[in-house]
Amino acid sequence: MQEAEIVTDIVFKIDGHVQKSFYSEEEYEELGCPLLIKWKKLRPICYEIIKGKRTPVKFRFVLKLAEEELQEMTDGLELGFTRQDIGGLYLNIVFENGKLNCITGTSLNIFTMDKTLERVWDKRVAIELEGTEKDENINKV
Protein backbone atom coordinates (compact mmCIF):
# COMPACT_ATOMS: atom_id res chain seq x y z
CA MET A 1 0.00 0.00 0.00
CA GLN A 2 1.37 3.35 -1.02
CA GLU A 3 -0.82 5.46 1.26
CA ALA A 4 -4.19 5.74 2.96
CA GLU A 5 -6.36 8.49 4.34
CA ILE A 6 -9.49 7.88 6.38
CA VAL A 7 -11.68 10.76 7.54
CA THR A 8 -14.07 10.12 10.41
CA ASP A 9 -14.31 12.59 13.28
CA ILE A 10 -10.56 13.02 12.79
CA VAL A 11 -8.21 12.41 9.87
CA PHE A 12 -6.02 9.30 9.82
CA LYS A 13 -3.12 9.32 7.35
CA ILE A 14 -0.96 6.29 6.71
CA ASP A 15 2.29 6.36 4.77
CA GLY A 16 2.77 2.82 3.49
CA HIS A 17 6.55 3.04 3.14
CA VAL A 18 8.32 0.51 5.35
CA GLN A 19 10.67 2.05 7.90
CA LYS A 20 13.73 -0.16 7.54
CA SER A 21 15.22 1.17 10.80
CA PHE A 22 12.31 -0.39 12.74
CA TYR A 23 13.58 -3.88 11.93
CA SER A 24 16.83 -5.68 12.56
CA GLU A 25 18.78 -6.57 9.40
CA GLU A 26 17.65 -10.20 9.70
CA GLU A 27 13.97 -9.30 10.17
CA TYR A 28 14.04 -6.93 7.22
CA GLU A 29 15.62 -9.57 4.99
CA GLU A 30 13.05 -12.15 6.15
CA LEU A 31 10.32 -9.74 5.05
CA GLY A 32 11.92 -9.62 1.60
CA CYS A 33 13.26 -6.06 1.95
CA PRO A 34 9.94 -4.42 1.01
CA LEU A 35 9.64 -0.74 0.20
CA LEU A 36 5.89 -0.75 0.89
CA ILE A 37 3.79 -2.49 3.53
CA LYS A 38 1.44 -5.21 2.28
CA TRP A 39 -2.28 -4.36 2.22
CA LYS A 40 -3.08 -7.54 4.15
CA LYS A 41 -1.13 -6.16 7.11
CA LEU A 42 -2.89 -2.78 7.08
CA ARG A 43 -6.37 -4.03 6.20
CA PRO A 44 -7.41 -4.95 9.78
CA ILE A 45 -6.11 -1.61 11.07
CA CYS A 46 -8.06 0.32 8.43
CA TYR A 47 -11.14 -1.79 9.12
CA GLU A 48 -10.99 -0.95 12.83
CA ILE A 49 -10.89 2.76 11.98
CA ILE A 50 -13.76 2.56 9.47
CA LYS A 51 -16.20 0.24 11.26
CA GLY A 52 -18.86 1.73 13.47
CA LYS A 53 -22.34 3.20 13.37
CA ARG A 54 -21.41 6.04 11.03
CA THR A 55 -20.05 5.94 7.54
CA PRO A 56 -16.69 7.70 7.20
CA VAL A 57 -16.77 11.17 5.67
CA LYS A 58 -14.33 9.79 3.10
CA PHE A 59 -11.45 7.41 2.64
CA ARG A 60 -8.76 6.91 0.04
CA PHE A 61 -6.42 3.97 -0.43
CA VAL A 62 -3.61 3.96 -2.98
CA LEU A 63 -2.48 0.40 -3.67
CA LYS A 64 0.59 -0.41 -5.75
CA LEU A 65 0.94 -3.76 -7.49
CA ALA A 66 3.80 -5.76 -5.95
CA GLU A 67 6.93 -6.08 -8.08
CA GLU A 68 6.61 -9.88 -8.30
CA GLU A 69 3.04 -9.59 -9.57
CA LEU A 70 4.03 -6.84 -12.00
CA GLN A 71 6.77 -9.07 -13.40
CA GLU A 72 4.33 -11.98 -13.71
CA MET A 73 1.73 -9.78 -15.40
CA THR A 74 4.15 -8.29 -17.92
CA ASP A 75 5.87 -11.57 -18.83
CA GLY A 76 4.81 -12.42 -22.35
CA LEU A 77 3.46 -8.96 -23.14
CA GLU A 78 4.87 -7.30 -26.22
CA LEU A 79 5.44 -3.76 -25.00
CA GLY A 80 7.23 -0.93 -26.73
CA PHE A 81 9.34 -0.42 -23.62
CA THR A 82 11.19 -2.44 -20.97
CA ARG A 83 10.14 -3.55 -17.49
CA GLN A 84 12.53 -0.95 -16.03
CA ASP A 85 10.48 1.77 -17.74
CA ILE A 86 7.46 0.91 -15.56
CA GLY A 87 7.29 2.99 -12.39
CA GLY A 88 4.27 1.13 -11.03
CA LEU A 89 0.67 0.08 -11.47
CA TYR A 90 -1.79 1.57 -9.00
CA LEU A 91 -5.35 1.16 -7.82
CA ASN A 92 -6.91 4.17 -6.13
CA ILE A 93 -9.98 3.36 -4.03
CA VAL A 94 -11.88 6.50 -3.07
CA PHE A 95 -15.08 6.80 -1.04
CA GLU A 96 -16.54 10.30 -0.90
CA ASN A 97 -20.04 11.80 -0.92
CA GLY A 98 -21.55 8.33 -0.57
CA LYS A 99 -19.87 7.04 -3.73
CA LEU A 100 -17.07 4.52 -4.12
CA ASN A 101 -14.72 4.89 -7.08
CA CYS A 102 -11.92 2.56 -8.13
CA ILE A 103 -9.44 4.20 -10.47
CA THR A 104 -6.47 2.48 -12.06
CA GLY A 105 -3.23 4.28 -12.70
CA THR A 106 -0.07 3.54 -14.63
CA SER A 107 3.27 5.20 -13.96
CA LEU A 108 5.88 5.03 -16.70
CA ASN A 109 9.35 6.52 -16.65
CA ILE A 110 9.14 7.23 -20.38
CA PHE A 111 6.61 8.67 -22.81
CA THR A 112 4.86 6.13 -25.01
CA MET A 113 1.69 5.91 -27.07
CA ASP A 114 1.49 2.16 -26.33
CA LYS A 115 -1.59 1.60 -24.14
CA THR A 116 -1.23 -2.19 -23.92
CA LEU A 117 -0.08 -2.15 -20.30
CA GLU A 118 -2.94 0.17 -19.27
CA ARG A 119 -5.52 -2.07 -20.95
CA VAL A 120 -4.11 -5.23 -19.36
CA TRP A 121 -4.02 -3.55 -15.92
CA ASP A 122 -7.61 -2.28 -16.29
CA LYS A 123 -8.77 -5.75 -17.28
CA ARG A 124 -6.95 -7.43 -14.41
CA VAL A 125 -8.43 -5.02 -11.86
CA ALA A 126 -11.92 -5.50 -13.30
CA ILE A 127 -11.56 -9.28 -13.01
CA GLU A 128 -10.31 -9.00 -9.42
CA LEU A 129 -13.16 -6.66 -8.45
CA GLU A 130 -15.73 -8.96 -10.01
CA GLY A 131 -14.30 -11.80 -7.95
CA THR A 132 -14.00 -14.09 -10.94
CA GLU A 133 -11.19 -16.48 -11.65
CA LYS A 134 -8.23 -14.94 -13.42
CA ASP A 135 -8.73 -15.06 -17.15
CA GLU A 136 -5.99 -17.07 -18.84
CA ASN A 137 -6.17 -14.62 -21.73
CA ILE A 138 -5.66 -11.53 -19.57
CA ASN A 139 -2.39 -10.68 -21.33
CA LYS A 140 -3.99 -11.00 -24.76
CA VAL A 141 -5.63 -7.58 -25.01
Could you tell me what each predicted segment is?
Residues 100-141:
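Mixed-charge, glycine-accented linear interaction segment located at domain edges/termini
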Residues 11, 19, 68-70, 100, ...:
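Generic "edge-of-domain/loop-turn" microfeature
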Residues 30-97:
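Surface-exposed, low-hydrophobicity interaction/linker segments
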Residues 1-40:
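Charge-rich, low-complexity N-terminal segments
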Residues 2, 6, 53-55, 102:
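Solvent-exposed loop and beta-edge segments used for protein-protein assembly and interaction
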